[in-house]
């Protein structure tokens, strides 16, 4: 038996060899990975990282803001979807990193804790959202963080909010490549009916404006400044519906690239670079990608 496979299994993880990541990303693109590792709890995640100390690995939440190369990757991917426990402590909530944001929002609604309604419908995990400081409709997840537990140099440590930097789609965790395991978040009491109404309103807006019927990796580009709307800029260039191979600029929202059924990593990357070039020519603005890209087993 493969020694790394055996050690990961003994560490309390389920392990799949040569698993296609296209089955684990929302855009349905991605080659085979040598080890797909599913830790069953925070402790098995810790042990898995120890096993992989001399083998390259990446952390994956729900794969919703991720673009992965088509070629096989000689790495391990630790997918945190089973780290999904939520514990309420008054007006504070302790939540594990693999918890889907939607599930956390529904939990908060039942507990009558308000504030995170804007995140209902964002399809990622709590850990991924904290990592990139996800936000929508004027809210960002970093506003609700009291402390975050991370794995750093083989040790579990808690960082308080005063030790954490949050910026626009940016954070300490992203800059320092820290592995998020749990977060303590703080909310305010709110009536269930009010929370539900807000969540339904945000979801209605998403359904109206975003291409939720086709595979995508979410919003592709960061907004370069507050008054520059990327989707509108791309639309003004007449690029809605423009496609390269199976990758297409969404006809519903030009800030999204969708997989029409046969898109490859190269199709999407070429389309990203084409859009960046056209926006630079017209507006003099350099677009940065919001989507995380794995190429040659590393973040691009």
Swiss-Prot record:
Cofactors demanded by this protein: FAD
- Residue positions of the active site: 169, 219, 290
Which keywords fit this entry according to its UniProt record? Cell cycle, Cell division, Cell shape, Cell wall biogenesis/degradation, Cytoplasm, FAD, Flavoprotein, NADP, Oxidoreductase, Peptidoglycan synthesis
The FAD-binding PCMH-type domain extends over 28-190
- The record's EC number reads 1.3.1.98
* Source superkingdom: Bacteria
Q: Which PROSITE patterns match?
A: FAD_PCMH
What would you give as a GO molecular function for this chain, any one?
FAD binding
Q: Name one GO cellular component term.
A: cytosol
| Biological process according to GO | cell division; cell wall organization; peptidoglycan biosynthetic process; regulation of cell shape
Major enzyme class: oxidoreductase
Short name of one Pfam family? MurB_C
Q: What does this protein do?
A: Cell wall formation.
Q: Which NCBIfam families match?
A: murB, PRK13905.1
Official protein name in the record:
UDP-N-acetylenolpyruvoylglucosamine reductase
Source taxonomy: Bacteria, Thermotogati, Thermotogota, Thermotogae, Thermotogales
Gene assigned in the entry = murB
């Amino acid at each position: 038996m493969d020694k790394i496979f055996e050690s990961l299994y003994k560490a309390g993880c389920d392990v799949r060899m040569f698993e296609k990541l296209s089955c684990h990303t929302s855009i349905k693109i991605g080659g085979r990975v040598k080890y797909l590792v599913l830790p069953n709890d925070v402790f098995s995640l810790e042990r898995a990282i120890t096993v992989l100390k001399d083998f390259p690995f990446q952390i994956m939440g729900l794969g919703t803001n991720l673009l992965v190369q088509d070629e096989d990757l000689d790495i391990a991917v630790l997918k945190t979807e089973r780290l999904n426990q939520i514990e309420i402590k008054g007006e504070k909530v302790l939540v594990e990193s693999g918890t889907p944001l939607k599930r956390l929002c529904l939990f908060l609604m039942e507990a009558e804790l308000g504030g995170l309604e804007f995140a209902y419908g964002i399809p990622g995990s709590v850990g991924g959202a904290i990592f990139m400081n996800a936000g929508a409709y004027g809210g960002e997840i970093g506003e609700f963080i009291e402390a975050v537990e991370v794995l750093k140099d083989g040790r579990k440590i808690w960082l308080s909010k005063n030790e954490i930097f949050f910026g626009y789609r940016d954070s300490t965790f992203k800059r320092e490549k820290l592995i998020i395991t749990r977060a303590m978040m703080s909310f305010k009491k709110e009536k269930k009916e009010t929370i539900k109404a807000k969540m339904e309103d945000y979801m209605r807006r998403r359904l109206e404006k975003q291409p939720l019927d086709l595979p995508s990796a979410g919003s592709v580009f960061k907004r370069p400044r507050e008054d520059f709307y990327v989707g509108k800029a791309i639309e003004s260039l007449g690029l809605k519906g423009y496609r390269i191979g199976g990758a297409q600029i969404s006809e519903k929202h030009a800030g999204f690239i969708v997989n029409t059924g046969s898109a490859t990593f190269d199709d999407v990357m070429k389309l990203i670079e084409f859009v960046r070039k056209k926006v630079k020519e017209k507006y003099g603005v350099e677009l940065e990608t919001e989507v995380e890209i794995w190429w040659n087993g590393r973040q691009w």
